[in-house]
Structure formats: structure tokens, C-alpha cells
């Protein structure tokens, strides 16, 4: 009798995706982040669901409903901090996942890569709207500042902002719609992740060498299932340590003050995972230019496959490109640091130089270096 997992319509899909999937035999732990992102998404949806049961999306009661969750609901504090820090873990995994794709040339799978860029935008939008929901000072002012950026769009800008706000300022209508979108988007993200996986399985995974691995495949189960479980355990270890020992480490103290439209916080800044983009936004003195740079800081990823000039796919055997890649990582860390600093000397000029270097590395230096490496190898 044929195995049920190979004949049952539903089991067949699971089997071909997670059990009998032919996988390269040499993929390293950098390939674990896809499954970790899946786990993060599940954790976020579950904790978010339980938070939504107790949360009220009204400006008068939102802040106190979050306080109520933390104080009165059984393990409410745990659910709330798992959700807040789960977002941080989500972004850590996302950045490492994208970094892996850039380093090993996984962006050559065009459909998979472009859906990945779309997923990154969707997750960033979801996280931004989620940050508004507790209705603290940073929630309110963050929402005001970021939505206001749309007013830089010529002709329709101010109308667009008022349309998003549902009034003439960030108020009850804004909070209610942000809650609705924050609830629905993770399910759209889950669907997109399914499509992401579908396109990946059309081509098969890339591997560290960047070479075709068709001649040397192994089944996903048990080899990579056990490897993924180890990754998940480490993720849970880091997340629970963060939640139980220092849950507010990555948060902003200002968000423990209820939103007050009459009192602006001294330093308005987003969560740590947006600081690099925020630094790029602030480094351009023109409003529209800043908004364009902000969008392009992520959208530039979609251009990367077309700028691949090397004859080799992976950076594994390209030391000059490796140097530039790690300079890019250092540059992003610098931008993250600058995004959290006040707008004053010397932070302004550091931010501007780091922003220029960011685009210069991706759009100019890396493609030129790849051509130089081809030349060295007489290719």
C-alpha cells in the first residue's frame, strides 16, 4: 500500500514541502532563518490573537486596556511581552535572512526574491501599525510623524494624509483602522509566505557554493527538520530570556506615558528595527527627498538581481565582494545607531555619509568589484 502522506491531497503538499523535499546537502545554519521566520509569524499571530481578546481600540481606553492586560489578565504580561519582543526577534531573523540572500546570491531566484521584498514591506507596515496600538506617547507621535510623511507627495499628499487619519489629526478613527489592518496583515503575510515557499520549491534551494546541487540532494526530513528544531529551540531560548529578564530592553520608556497631543516627546524615534531607514530619511533635508530615500532604502533590494555582474553566484570565493558586504553590514549598524541619536552635530554628517555609502555600495561599488573579480580570474 502506498504511504498515505504520498497520496492524501493535503498530506501530499506537506510531504513535498517538508518531508520528501530534495535539499542541498551542504546548506549551513544561515538557511535556518526561513523556518525561524515561520515560527516567529505563528508566535506573533497566536499572542496577538490573545491580546486582541482584551484590547480595546478606542483612544480613551486603549492605554488602560494594555495596562489591564499586564496587571489583571492571567499571564497577560507574558503574552504582551512575547508579542512585543517577538517582533524584535522577527526583524532580527528577517535581516539575517535577507543578508544571507545577498551574500550567497539567492536573489537570482527572481520571483522568490521579489515576493521576499514585498513580505519585508508588509512586515514593516504591520510592525509600524502595531506600535501605534498601545497609545503611549511614542505610539501617538510616531504615527503622527510617519503618516505625515505622505503629505510630501505632490498634489494629493495632504488629502491622502487626512484620508488615512480619518480626520484632521491622528485620533480614534486612525487607531481603529490601524488595529483592523494590524489584525488582518499577518494573515496576508502568511499567504505571501506560502507563495514565497511555492516559488522557492520550483527552483530548489540555493547553497553556500552557489553551484547547482542537483547531483547531491538529501531529503529534508530528518536532516533539516532536526536542524530547524535546534534553530527554533535557540530562538525560543533567546526570546524567553529577553521576555523574562529584560522585557523593556528594546522598548521606549516614553511609551509608558499615555498619548498626549499637547506634549511632544524630546526625541521622536521608531522601534530599533526601523532606525536605519529613519536615519536615511533624516539625512536628507528635503521632505519629499527624504521620503523617496526611505522607500528606496528597502526597494533597492529589488534592483540587486539586475546589478549582479559576477560570473559566480555566491560571495563564498570572492574576497573583495566579501569586504564590501561586511562594510555594508557595518554601515547599516552605524545608520541604526544614528537613527536613535538627536539631530545635531556630529550625528547629522555621520548619518549623511552613512546614507550615501549605503546606496553607493549596493548600486555602484559591488557591481564594479564583481567585474574586477571576473577580470582577475580571466573570466
Curated annotation (Swiss-Prot):
PROSITE patterns, per the entry: CYTB_CTER, CYTB_NTER
Cofactor dependency: heme b
Keywords linked to the UniProt accession: Electron transport, Heme, Iron, Membrane, Metal-binding, Mitochondrion, Mitochondrion inner membrane, Respiratory chain, Transmembrane, Transmembrane helix, Transport, Ubiquinone
Membrane topology: Multi-pass membrane protein
Any one Gene Ontology molecular-function term assigned to this protein's record: metal ion binding
Gene3D superfamilies cross-referenced by the UniProt entry: Cytochrome Bc1 Complex, Chain C (1.20.810.10)
Binding site for heme b b566: 97, 196
Binding residues annotated for heme b b562, in chain numbering: 83, 182
Compartments where found: Mitochondrion inner membrane
Binding-site list for a ubiquinone: 201
Main subcellular location: mitochondrion
Cofactor note text: Binds 2 heme b groups non-covalently.
GO biological process, one term: mitochondrial electron transport, ubiquinol to cytochrome c
Membrane-crossing segments per the record: 33-53, 77-98, 113-133, 178-198, 226-246, 288-308, 320-340, 347-367
Gene Ontology CC: mitochondrial inner membrane; respiratory chain complex III
Function description: Component of the ubiquinol-cytochrome c reductase complex (complex III or cytochrome b-c1 complex) that is part of the mitochondrial respiratory chain. The b-c1 complex mediates electron transfer from ubiquinol to cytochrome c. Contributes to the generation of a proton gradient across the mitochondrial membrane that is then used for ATP synthesis.
Note: Heme 1 (or BL or b562) is low-potential and absorbs at about 562 nm, and heme 2 (or BH or b566) is high-potential and absorbs at about 566 nm.
Quaternary data: The cytochrome bc1 complex contains 11 subunits: 3 respiratory subunits (MT-CYB, CYC1 and UQCRFS1), 2 core proteins (UQCRC1 and UQCRC2) and 6 low-molecular weight proteins (UQCRH/QCR6, UQCRB/QCR7, UQCRQ/QCR8, UQCR10/QCR9, UQCR11/QCR10 and a cleavage product of UQCRFS1). This cytochrome bc1 complex then forms a dimer.
Protein name: Cytochrome b
Organism: Sorex haydeni
Gene assigned in the entry: MT-CYB
Amino acid at each position: 500500500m502506498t504511504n498515505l502522506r504520498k497520496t492524501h491531497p493535503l498530506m501530499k503538499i506537506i510531504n513535498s514541502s517538508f518531508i520528501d523535499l530534495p535539499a542541498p546537502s551542504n546548506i549551513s545554519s544561515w538557511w535556518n532563518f526561513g523556518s525561524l521566520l515561520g515560527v516567529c509569524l505563528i508566535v506573533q499571530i497566536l499572542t496577538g490573537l490573545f491580546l486582541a481578546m482584551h484590547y480595546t481600540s478606542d483612544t480613551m481606553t486603549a492605554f488602560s486596556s494594555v495596562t489591564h492586560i499586564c496587571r489583571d489578565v492571567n499571564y497577560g504580561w507574558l503574552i504582551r511581552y512575547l508579542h512585543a519582543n517577538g517582533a524584535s526577534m522577527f526583524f532580527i531573523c528577517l535581516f539575517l535572512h535577507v543578508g544571507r540572500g545577498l551574500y550567497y546570491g539567492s536573489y537570482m531566484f527572481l520571483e522568490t526574491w521579489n515576493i521576499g521584498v514585498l513580505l519585508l514591506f508588509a512586515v514593516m507596515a504591520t510592525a509600524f501599525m502595531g506600535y501605534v496600538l498601545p497609545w503611549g506617547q511614542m505610539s501617538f507621535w510616531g504615527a503622527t510623524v510617519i503618516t505625515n510623511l505622505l503629505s510630501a507627495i505632490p498634489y494629493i499628499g495632504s488629502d491622502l494624509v487626512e484620508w488615512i487619519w480619518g480626520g484632521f489629526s491622528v485620533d480614534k478613527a486612525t487607531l481603529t483602522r490601524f488595529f483592523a489592518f494590524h489584525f488582518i496583515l499577518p494573515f496576508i503575510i502568511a499567504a505571501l509566505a506560502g507563495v514565497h515557499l511555492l516559488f522557492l520549491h520550483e527552483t530548489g534551494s540555493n547553497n553556500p557554493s552557489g553551484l547547482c546541487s542537483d547531483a547531491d540532494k538529501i531529503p529534508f526530513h530528518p536532516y533539516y527538520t532536526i536542524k530547524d528544531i535546534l534553530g527554533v529551540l535557540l530562538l525560543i531560548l533567546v526570546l524567553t530570556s529577553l521576555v523574562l529578564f529584560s522585557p523593556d530592553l528594546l522598548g521606549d520608556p516614553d511609551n509608558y506615558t499615555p498619548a498626549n497631543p499637547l506634549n511632544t516627546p524630546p526625541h521622536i524615534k521608531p522601534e530599533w528595527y526601523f532606525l536605519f531607514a529613519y536615519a536615511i530619511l533624516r539625512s536628507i533635508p528635503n521632505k519629499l527627498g527624504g521620503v523617496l530615500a526611505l522607500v528606496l532604502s528597502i526597494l533597492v533590494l529589488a534592483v540587486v538581481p539586475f546589478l549582479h555582474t559576477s560570473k559566480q553566484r555566491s560571495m563564498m570565493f570572492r574576497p573583495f565582494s566579501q569586504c564590501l558586504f561586511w562594510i555594508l553590514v557595518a554601515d547599516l549598524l552605524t545608520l541604526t545607531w544614528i537613527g536613535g541619536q538627536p539631530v545635531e552635530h556630529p550625528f547629522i554628517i555621520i548619518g549623511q555619509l552613512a546614507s550615501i555609502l549605503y546606496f553607493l555600495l549596493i548600486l555602484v561599488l559591488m557591481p564594479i568589484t564583481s567585474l574586477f573579480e571576473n577580470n582577475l580570474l580571466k573570466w
